[in-house]
Amino acid sequence: MQAADGKKYLTDVANTEQLFRLIQSVPSPKAEPFKLWIAQVAKERLDQMQDPELSIEQAMADYKRLGYSDNWINQRLKSIEIRKDLTDEWKKRGLEEGLHFATLTDIIYKSWSDMTSKEYKRFKGLRKENLRDNMTNKELVLNMLAELSTKEISEASEPDTFSEHINVAQQGGEVARSPIRAGSQNREKRYLTAQRPKDN
């Protein structure tokens, strides 16, 4: 691996999972606090699998800890529910996660915001961060409207081919585009902003 001085050195690297496994295998008492923490996190995850409401409570606590407002957190949780309803509809129609979902999501974004998810992330100065976690309340509402509309149009029209799904996604995004078009050009710029919810 190339170091800051430009020279290459043999370097041990690990991903997160490998690092946790390595910590578990260390016999030193100094590793014990990490092992206990890993066990605690695993227990919490198992509890959440038994009682999904705990996952929601954990998500709320995590967003709060990251500095999001209660109002934004409520909007975000609602957007997660609407997104899941849409992806459930796509699965029911035989679409697969991955390329299908990503393509249709890009079409929805492009139809209401004039940006694909990649362009939207660039607009907000994001790299690996989740785009929806960095949308303002207005942007979340518009995206929820687009995704909810897409789901309802899909249920009504029962698309069979992927090209039909593309058409449905465009129609759903257009529904959310209407409030933006109804306003002036200045209002449109206020709907879409490089600002992030934690910037307020």
Model-identified regions with their sequence ranges:
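Positively charged, phosphate-engaging catalytic surfaces used for nucleic-acid and nucleotide handling
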Residues: 4, 8, 14-18, 24-200
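Short, basic alpha-helical nucleic acid-contact segments in DNA-binding proteins
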Residues: 1
